[in-house]
Structure formats: C-alpha cells, structure tokens
Amino acid sequence: MKPSVILYKALPDDLLQRLQEHFTVHQVANLSPQTVEQNAAIFAEAEGLLGSNENVDAALLEKMPKLRATSTISVGYDNFDVDALTARKILLMHTPTVLTETVADTLMALVLSTARRVVEVAERVKAGEWTASIGPDWYGTDVHHKTLGIVGMGRIGMALAQRAHFGFNMPILYNARRHHKEAEERFNARYCDLDTLLQESDFVCLILPLTDETYHLFGAEQFGKMKSSAIFINAGRGPVVDENALIAALQKGEIHAAGLDVFEQEPLSVDSPLLSMANVVAVPHIGSATHETRYGMAACAVDNLIDALQGKVEKNCVNPHVAD
C-alpha cells in the first residue's frame, strides 16, 4: 500500500502524476483548522505534506501523528515550526537552488526601475503628461559604477553580485556572517561591517531570511546611516525591516527611494503609505514568479518529498540530522 500524502497547493498535471506514482495523494485547499477538522482521518494517516504559503505549527502536527516529511515549494521556511518538526523527527525539505538566478533578476530589476524611475515615468506617460521634451524632473540616476551594498551573501547575493559586477561595473560591498572568498575573488567584493556598508553604498540590497536574529534588523537607526541619495531594495523577507521606520525614512528624505518585493504583512494593505509614494516600486512578492522557475520549484519539491519518504535525504533538507 502506498504511503498517504497531503497536497495543499495545485501542481501541474505531470508533477501530480509523478507524485501519484509513489503515493496516495489527497488534495486539500489549505491547512486551516476547519480544513484539518473536516479531513481529520486523512490528516491522521498522512506521512507526507507538500505545498506552500501555509503555516505548519505544533497544533497541526498534533493532528498528524504519522507525518514523516514535509516539503515546501519555497526556499524560505519561516512559516514552519522547525523545532516542533525536529522534535517529532519530521524532515523539512525546501527548494534553495532552483530560484537563485530568477530572484537575482528581480533584485536587479528593482535596482534599475527605482534608479531610472521606470514605473513612475511610465505612469506619467499613460496619464498624458508627456507633452514636450522631458526635463530634469523626469530624470533618474545612474546605476553603472555606483556602489552596491549586499546584506546577505548567499546564493542569491552571489548571483546579484555577478550581475552588478560584470554587467554594470559596480563596486560591491557586502555584509554576512562570514567572509565569502569566492565573492571577493570573482567580483572584487569587499567585506565590511553593516554600518560601513550603509554609509558608503548607493544601493543597499537586503537578501536575508527571517529569523529571531534578523527580525526588524533594519529600522530607524539603519536608515539614518544611509546616504540621502541611497536606494533601498528588499527581496528577502518583509519583517526583516521595520516598515514604519522605512516609511518615515522615505517621508523625511533620509533615503532617496525603495524597491520592495516583500512586506511585513502580505498582501500589502491598500492604504499603506508606500503605495502613494512615487519613489517606491512595490511588487507583490514576485521574486521567483516566472513560469519556468515556479515549475522548477514544484518539481524540486515533489522530488524532495519522494526522496525524504524513501530515506534518500542527500540535499535540500533543513534538519537533516533527523534522518540519522
């Protein structure tokens, strides 16, 4: 008899078929308490869980005594109670490598669109304001040869540094938990403390996961140390930034502009002051949102779950010691 797994996000037909070759698959709309209660017997028997954008906490795990592995269609896993999973010897699988290049593209797009005011001036054209040759009030700022500060030099940070160094001749500063020899050798990146990065960078790109240590890492103090001409980019996790402090910094002119793919609360409230600021490019968490990459992430998540439930945990596992 095939192991039972619960799928809480739709998959392309071919990936669903691959999953069904190995497991009895039960599809549910979400992991809300109501859904769990209505499908109590299914949850009680499930050995695997696959999906994204839902919280997996101790309360849910209590309803799933046979769960052995959960696979998320994402690189981030701050919506999972890792301690609770580990205590129950449940493997947590994620998709850390599939989306690297695509998210780096998104970061570079935010750098360019904020600096050159692409969204703002495009809207002015659509509004019929382009009635003569443009003047300085339409101008943006250069990206090439400007200093890029990267906070978090992981896979995505490296991919961004590659684009900035080779494509735009940008000097690169970075701050991370440790020195990154490859970044320094390939891109001439310079390691520095966070204060130095903030003070010297023309663009500050935040690429950090959400943890207890990174929550509200960026607040009024950090924005106050940035150049008034600096542009802030966040495509990591929204709560790493104190959004009220960011709004205040933009309103006071402490920083020049912001390009944001993530927010403290998502979806972003329609009455957020960020949406009324011409110098803010706000997009709906599109970091990995291309057809190709989202398919690749789903395929990776399916393979991860198959491997985990077959005892083949060699990569993409958040808590691999559980398998020991």
From Swiss-Prot:
Q: What is its EC number?
A: 1.1.1.79, 1.1.1.81
Q: Which GO terms describe its molecular function?
A: glyoxylate reductase (NADPH) activity; hydroxypyruvate reductase (NADH) activity; hydroxypyruvate reductase (NADPH) activity; NAD binding
The listed locations are: Cytoplasm
Report the active site residues: R237, E266, H285 (proton donor)
Q: Which PROSITE patterns match?
A: D_2_HYDROXYACID_DH_2 (PS00670), D_2_HYDROXYACID_DH_3 (PS00671)
Q: Provide this UniProt record's keywords sorted from A to Z.
A: Cytoplasm, NAD, NADP, Oxidoreductase
- Pfam families given for it? 2-Hacid_dh (PF00389), 2-Hacid_dh_C (PF02826)
Which cystines does this chain contain? none
Gene3D superfamilies with a match to the protein in the record:
NAD(P)-binding Rossmann-like Domain
What is known about its subunit structure?
Answer: Homodimer.
Q: What does this protein do?
A: Catalyzes the NADPH-dependent reduction of glyoxylate and hydroxypyruvate into glycolate and glycerate, respectively.
Which protein family is it in? Answer: Belongs to the D-isomer specific 2-hydroxyacid dehydrogenase family. GhrB subfamily.
Q: What is this protein called?
A: Glyoxylate/hydroxypyruvate reductase B
| Originating species | Escherichia coli O6:K15:H31 (strain 536 / UPEC)
Show the taxonomic lineage. Bacteria, Pseudomonadati, Pseudomonadota, Gammaproteobacteria, Enterobacterales
What gene is this protein translated from?
A: ghrB
